Amino acid sequence: SYFEKDRLTTVQYPEERDVLPENSRNFPFLVFDTNDPEAGLRCVACKICEKECPPQCIYIVKSEEKKPDYMGKPQFYPATFDIDISVCMSCQICVEVCPFEAIKMDKVYELSRRERFDALLMRKQDLAKSNDYYHRIHPLEAEAVDANLKAAAEKKKPVPAAAPASG
């Protein structure tokens, strides 16, 4: 019921903050796996999220050259990855369509700015957050994602050649 005591609490914000549930979503962020946000970024600029975004608030420019990703495989990377948070409707479609588990939903909701235009465009440097951060805000989901990525990496490893038969 709407009138339950648990639902009718007053919080002295910003001194006190309610704990957000794990499945809450606000705005997307990019996950990186190493200590370097640029080198460890999971995004390979495939632009699927940009194409699928209903309000078209994601802007990606693919790099000209390839560089090794966090697994050592040469990949393209986003030279530019911007999200216009004044347009984003937090629908999570970008997260669902990403085949590389590179984009996830954040719990940060305090993104107000004094300026109206350029400050509401989140750049790649602002969007990149570590896998450790992802584990802190979505622990159950992050464990499952990491297990799936590890299983996929093991599956792609080449099988060692069999020893020649003696005879």
Model-derived segments and their meaning:
Residues 1-87, 96, 101-167:
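Non-ligating segments of multi-cofactor redox enzymes
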Residues 91:
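Basic, alpha-helical nucleic-acid-binding regions used in initiation and control of genome expression
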